[in-house]
Amino acid sequence: MARYVFITGGVVSSLGKGIAAAALAALLQARGYRVRIRKLDPYLNVDPGTISPYQHGEVFVTDDGAETDLDLGHYERFTGRPANQQDNITTGRIYRNIIEKERRGDYLGATVQVIPHVTDEIKNFVLEGNEDYDFVLCEIGGTVGDIEAMPFLEAIRQLGNELPRGTAVYIHLTLMPYIPAAGELKTKPTQHSVKELRSIGIAPDILLVRADREIPESERRKLSLFCNVRESAVIQALDVATIYDVPIAYHKEGLDSEVLSAFGIDPAPKPRMDRWEEVSHRLHNPEGEVTIAVVGKYTGLKDAYKSLIEALHHGGLANKVKVNLDWIEAQVFESEDPAPYLEKVHGILVPGGFGERGAEGKILAAKFARERKVPYFGICFGMQMACIEAARNLVGIEDASSSEFGPTREPVVGLMTEWLKGNMLEKRAAAGDLGGTMRLGAYEAVLKPDSKIAQIYGSTDIHERHRHRYEVNIDYKDRLEAAGLNFAGMSPDGVLPETVEYADHPWFIGVQYHPELKSRPFEPHPLFASFIEAAIEQSRLV
């Protein structure tokens, strides 16, 4: 039978509940346990697919096509377990399910209410499909006290009573701020947060306390006394240099031991931390460094590129170098010469995005990389802009553009109206809904055996995750290839271009999919490892 760990947050948002959940899962895995992590998001959107990246950050896509919270990316990277549609739920999805049931008459005329119908739907989500796991970690989004989170907190309170005794543990993540004028850390915000949680009916078993400096023993005793938890269960969560230091830091503080003790597991299996120690060693002892320019649209909020950032660092791990990121807003190149920004970097990456803003700047970045022989990695939108650049400057199609930007006589990039998903034909219309209507999830691609990208993968058959509505127009394939842009990867039916590259360029690859979503610290994605390797070579030339 699975044991359940419920992780809540208090005082302020963005404390790192997702990282805490992922780190704890990694520690339990290191002891040989099978672990699943689930995220419960209180917002009313059905999923984050249509939320602005500036508000929500990255949309993480799973193999089965779910558009989910970016925390699921942390879960995958820390545990290696692929997430799926059933690992993320939102208030919007819960209400949609309930309304559909009510319309069908499933409630037999009952008045549909938050309690029991909404809370029951949440509990069903938490409990479903956990037969193969020893531990299920549930992160509750938001902060204790938020009105949106109340049904979720009530649901996990009920589960604490309904689950067999000793199979549910509550962890509360809080902040202990340092007040410079007083010269001390303050416990009062944590005390009030726990008081709020207890008023709902949840008594935390463990306090995970974020702080920017060591918490004195006297303050831990104070928290233990006023929050009614064991002193050993007041765990300090100090700031660390990288997120990959968190599992080791939490293990040293005894978080995993305290969780197992709360479940009555004694003696517990000893953890094997060698993998995490190796990653930490490589991160803190690089043998060199490279600089990658990320020419994007949402550079003001790095969370919009969370998986991309981590995948680049994984590429650095594979090559034992530090990867420095130079963030450049693509619009800058529409009014300024790209050369001063790009001459000293060792690689250029143009990530995914939507809309016309910044597109011309990304096209100019691709042009600079092609002409100056600088390693270029175009992902999704970045591949599309590279193809438009080639069409304009190599093929001579001056009006080459994307139908995403409006009507055009030369739609080198156009809206996909149909594609195969397994044996099913998926269809879309330009006037259709935005939510959940893209080409989403893992799809197969076939690579040319003699291509650079096939050599990098070591295979001609790959499966990668997609999230896009627009695709390079196959009608332009022959002219682009004649100009030197090789369509090295296609969908199995030969209709959708998946990868492009230049044979006469040291490293210029565009991919329609999102390889960053499948990169792990222990298994860096081969494209990112190869891209950073090419950047190292470029660093010797600059």
From Swiss-Prot:
InterPro entries: Class_I_gatase-like (IPR029062), CTP_synthase (IPR004468), CTP_synthase_N (IPR017456), GATASE (IPR017926), GATase1_CTP_Synthase (IPR033828), P-loop_NTPase (IPR027417). Keywords: ATP-binding, Glutamine amidotransferase, Ligase, Magnesium, Metal-binding, Nucleotide-binding, Pyrimidine biosynthesis. Allosterically activated by GTP, when glutamine is the substrate; GTP has no effect on the reaction when ammonia is the substrate. The allosteric effector GTP functions by stabilizing the protein conformation that binds the tetrahedral intermediate(s) formed during glutamine hydrolysis. Inhibited by the product CTP, via allosteric rather than competitive inhibition. GO terms for cellular component: cytosol. L-glutamine binds at residues 54, 353, 381-384, 404, 469. The active site is at 380 (nucleophile), 514, 516. Its EC number is 6.3.4.2. Mg(2+) binds at residues 71, 139. Residues 1-265 are annotated as: Amidoligase domain. Pfam families: CTP_synth_N, GATase. One of its GO terms (biological process) is 'de novo' CTP biosynthetic process. Pathway: Pyrimidine metabolism; CTP biosynthesis via de novo pathway; CTP from UDP: step 2/2. CTP binds at residues 13, 146-148, 186-191, 222. Signal peptide: none annotated. Residues 291-541 form the Glutamine amidotransferase type-1 domain. UTP binds at residues 13, 186-191, 222. It is an enzyme of class 6 (ligase). One of its GO terms (molecular function) is CTP synthase activity. ATP binds at residues 14-19, 71. SUPFAM superfamilies: Class I glutamine amidotransferase-like (SSF52317), P-loop containing nucleoside triphosphate hydrolases (SSF52540). Catalyzes the ATP-dependent amination of UTP to CTP with either L-glutamine or ammonia as the source of nitrogen. Regulates intracellular CTP levels through interactions with the four ribonucleotide triphosphates. Belongs to the CTP synthase family. HAMAP family: PyrG. CTPSs have evolved a hybrid strategy for distinguishing between UTP and CTP. The overlapping regions of the product feedback inhibitory and substrate sites recognize a common feature in both compounds, the triphosphate moiety. To differentiate isosteric substrate and product pyrimidine rings, an additional pocket far from the expected kinase/ligase catalytic site, specifically recognizes the cytosine and ribose portions of the product inhibitor. This is CTP synthase. It comes from Brucella canis (strain ATCC 23365 / NCTC 10854 / RM-666). The gene is pyrG.
